[in-house]
Amino acid sequence: MASGNAHIGKPAPDFTGTAVVDGAFKEIKLSDYRGKYVVLFFYPLDFTFVCPTEIIAFSDHAEDFRKLGCEVLGVSVDSQFTHLAWINTPRKEGGLGPLNIPLLADVTKSLSQNYGVLKNDEGIAYRGLFIIDAKGVLRQITVNDLPVGRSVDEALRLVQAFQYTDEHGEVCPAGWKPGSDTIKPNVDDSKEYFSKHN
């Protein structure tokens, strides 16, 4: 896996590329999404086995993310033509069917390399997931090995948690969900949380 240029708390590496959006090819840039949160997820290859389960799950929850002012973008090293062929394949045959999220082509592998998820020996991406805030700052990175898919619910929860901390200045404990107690991040005020939960 390459080291990449994606670092927590720093601006996310910008990119421009061709994506399949609503069944058509479209040039997109990360900077197009400034002012919104972005969940950028990499997956190994089209026409595989775990990948469609993740992509369909993210697509099926796209509106949940949009309600939070967040867009979801999928990326693999496949071409936009392969993405389109997979989208045009019915789900019952291992295809994706119509999607509610863009799939970005990274045929040069530069995006995977830049984000540090390129599996050099195979020329494919690990299952990297990056949460980028409305200012373009990278807030979260997770990278799974190839055989295990990611949780869309956890990605949604993380976006909600980062947005909450940005708005309220409090921090979110393990397993936090919207409506749960948070912690005031100083020694004295944090005792309110700890006395209630211990």
Curated annotation (Swiss-Prot):
GO molecular function, one term: thioredoxin peroxidase activity
Name the UniProt record assigns to this protein: Peroxiredoxin-2
GO cellular component, one term: cytosol
Originating organism: Rattus norvegicus
Catalytic activity, as annotated: a hydroperoxide + [thioredoxin]-dithiol = an alcohol + [thioredoxin]-disulfide + H2O
InterPro entries assigned: AhpC/TSA (IPR000866), Peroxiredoxin (IPR050217), Peroxiredoxin_AhpC-typ (IPR024706), Peroxiredoxin_C (IPR019479), Thioredoxin-like_sf (IPR036249), Thioredoxin_domain (IPR013766)
Note: The active site is a conserved redox-active cysteine residue, the peroxidatic cysteine (C(P)), which makes the nucleophilic attack on the peroxide substrate. The peroxide oxidizes the C(P)-SH to cysteine sulfenic acid (C(P)-SOH), which then reacts with another cysteine residue, the resolving cysteine (C(R)), to form a disulfide bridge. The disulfide is subsequently reduced by an appropriate electron donor to complete the catalytic cycle. In this typical 2-Cys peroxiredoxin, C(R) is provided by the other dimeric subunit to form an intersubunit disulfide.
Phosphothreonine: residues carrying this PTM: T182
GO terms under biological process: cell redox homeostasis; cellular response to oxidative stress; defense response to tumor cell; extrinsic apoptotic signaling pathway; hydrogen peroxide catabolic process; hydrogen peroxide metabolic process; leukocyte activation; negative regulation of extrinsic apoptotic signaling pathway
Keywords, ordered alphabetically: Acetylation, Antioxidant, Cytoplasm, Disulfide bond, Oxidoreductase, Peroxidase, Phosphoprotein, Redox-active center
Gene3D superfamilies: Glutaredoxin
